[in-house]
């Protein structure tokens, strides 16, 4: 499943949603995966975009990846940095685990060993 920079959400190479917020350099894309209910919600600069998308429940592995020619991609799983740049606003996080640029959606926490047992 992926959120493309032109505002499309694709799953298994099939459009799930189109006409959503597009993005370019400097955009922060947030991903909230709910593996109890098998859904994912995307966020653009802290605001949800589109509807939640259903995930396949059984026998799938999910991993983060990004790609675009001649582009640099940085991930923050709660350490408070994108590469060597610290987040500027440190949004709230109900679990107190992780530092993010924007507020973490209710019921979600950092993808880390500390957040697995909540």
Residue positions per predicted region:
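PRY/SPRY (B30.2) beta-sandwich protein-interaction domains
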Residues: 1-118
């Amino acid at each position: 499943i992926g959120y493309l920079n032109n505002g499309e959400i694709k799953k298994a190479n099939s459009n799930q949603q189109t006409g959503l917020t597009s993005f370019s350099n400097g955009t922060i894309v947030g991903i909230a995966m709910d593996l109890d209910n098998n859904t994912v919600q995307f966020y653009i600069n802290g605001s949800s975009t589109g509807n939640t998308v259903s995930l396949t429940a059984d026998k799938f592995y999910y991993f983060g990846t990004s790609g675009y020619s001649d582009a640099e991609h940085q991930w923050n799983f709660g350490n408070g940095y994108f590469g060597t740049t610290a987040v500027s606003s440190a949004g709230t996080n109900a679990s107190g685990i992780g530092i993010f640029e924007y507020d973490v959606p209710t019921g979600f926490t950092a993808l880390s060993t500390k957040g697995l047992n909540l």
